[in-house]
Regions:
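Conserved catalytic/switch belt of AAA+ P-loop NTPases
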Residues: 302-352
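Conserved nucleotide-binding/hydrolysis micro-motifs of P-loop NTPases
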Residues: 273-276, 299-302, 328, 332-338, ...
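Pre-Walker A (pre-P-loop) alpha-helix and adjacent loop at the N terminus of AAA/AAA+ ATPase modules
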Residues: 205-239
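AAA+ P-loop ATPase mechanoenzymes
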Residues: 1-214, 218
Length: 437
């Protein structure tokens, strides 16, 4: 194995701590007799455990070795794979090196573990190549990643040579992308102590669609039109969904992500205290072949908070314009995002700010930077009943209540639980359905 791995060129950036690199070192030590057998077995088991952990996280099955190698190909961001992501496979000298690397992966796919297993008295690789995973709920692993990895893994296993692997892998890069953006649709920002960050995939995204949101047809239409323009490469506006609590603003954003993910839409969730990282985040994604929504949920600022300045700088562009593949999407219960007080309107009570009204105007102008502002208001009584009936109709086992009983109970529920809203209706149906189980 170490001979094969040493021949990689474009895909040589595996990382010294990668499973493949570590196994390569172990096999080299075994071949040269440079390590005692019990130590080799222990080192192998450490990497097998890492592979099992990876398989559990991403839902690998059947042949974990093949799935792992496929995962490496999918995740490896190099000059070749990133170019294929942007423009697909094209004629060029680099294809010679790519096919040489794919020939290496073909040999790794067909690698014979029997000699080392027999010599060390182990069978772990045989088990990995004939693996039956414990059934798991979709929320426990990255289901969309699992489906893509296993499909490509099976196709590569059936490929006769590096030319077929080249076609399969480059088609994946073109259609799905490379790295974490190719395998996931939503991410959150994880800061580290050095002031930098990583993007971590979000596993349990709600599978909601806009059609699941009852009512709000004008709002959904406007959001869909703006998103359609965005993913089609046309001009689109930053979006502010504002209005009453529990009316489906955040749900609409998740739904639009699900509906357009197959066309390259991705979402990065950011919190207010992370706004100082916005320029770094945009620099990381601006050259990728995806459309990114930077999502801010429940956006608002108190009088003393100044983080809005980072957001304004990104929206307005400054020296560097906002990339065409980045859109700011925010939800808020406020139409004016920065809190305003009566004192703000009086230049005489400036507390050191000679032109306080100018300062106030600067703060309150943030909402105007969102060219697409969509208002969500609480439903009236009839609309609330329509939502209750609609959600109840989706229950697979239905409800034992008559319609009149259902609506009367819904009215009593909203009085005690925050008033009329779509969220209240959903919580009510959850409660009623729970009583029947």
């Amino acid at each position: 194995m170490y001979r094969e791995v040493s021949q990689l060129l474009l895909y040589s950036n595996l990382g010294e701590d990668s499973i493949l690199r570590q196994l390569s070192g172990i096999f080299s030590d075994w071949a040269h007799g440079e390590c005692e057998k019990p130590v080799l077995v222990s080192r192998i088991y450490q990497q097998v455990k890492r592979l099992l952990d990876l398989a559990t996280r991403y839902g690998f099955n059947c042949n974990l070795w093949h799935d792992y190698l496929t995962f490496v190909l999918m995740m490896n961001e190099n000059s070749f794979s990133l170019t294929c992501e942007r423009v697909g496979a094209s004629d060029g000298s680099v294809n010679h090196f790519a096919k040489a690397d794919f020939a290496v992966f073909k040999r790794l796919f067909d690698f014979d573990f029997a000699p080392i297993e027999q010599d060390l008295g182990i069978d772990c690789f045989t088990v990995l190549e004939n693996y039956t995973a414990i059934p798991k709920k979709a929320q426990m692993y990255y289901r969309t990643v699992s489906e893509k990895v296993r499909a490509l893994s099976a196709a590569i296993a059936g490929a006769k040579d590096e030319n077929e692997i080249f076609d399969l892998v480059t088609a994946h890069y073109r259609d799905c992308g490379v790295g974490m953006f190719g395998l996931n649709r939503a991410f959150r920002i994880q800061e580290d102590e050095n002031g930098s960050f990583t993007l971590n995939a979000i596993n349990n995204i709600d599978s909601v669609l806009l059609s699941d949101l009852i009512g709000y047809e004008p709002q959904k239409k406007e959001l869909r039109q703006n998103t359609e323009a965005f993913v089609s490469g046309h001009a689109a506006n930053n979006v502010l969904l504002y209005g009453d609590a529990g009316t489906g603003k955040s749900t609409s954003v998740k739904a639009i992500l699900n509906e357009y993910a197959d066309r390259g839409l991705r979402m990065i969730e950011i919190y207010k205290h992370q706004f100082g990282l916005l320029s770094q985040v945009i620099a990381k994604i601006k050259n990728r072949n995806y459309r990114f929504m930077i999502f801010i949920d429940d956006l608002s600022f108190e009088e003393h908070e100044v983080e809005y300045k980072f957001l304004k700088a990104v929206i307005e562009g400054g020296v560097e314009t906002r990339p065409a593949n980045v859109l700011i999407v925010a939800t808020s219960n406020r139409r004016h995002l920065v809190q305003e007080t009566w004192k703000d309107r009086d230049d005489m009570e400036h507390n050191g700010d000679i032109h306080r009204s100018d300062t106030m105007e600067e703060r309150l102008s943030l909402a105007a930077r969102f060219g697409c502002a969509i208002c969500y208001v609480s439903p009236n009584r009839q609309q609330y009943h329509d939502i209750v009936r609609g959600i109840a109709a989706r229950l697979p086992d239905g409800l034992s209540l008559t319609e009149d009983e259902l609506l009367q109970a819904a009215n009593r529920w909203e009085i005690r639980h925050g008033g009329i809203s779509g969220r209240t209706a959903q919580q009510f149906i959850n409660y009623i359905a729970g009583l029947q189980t």
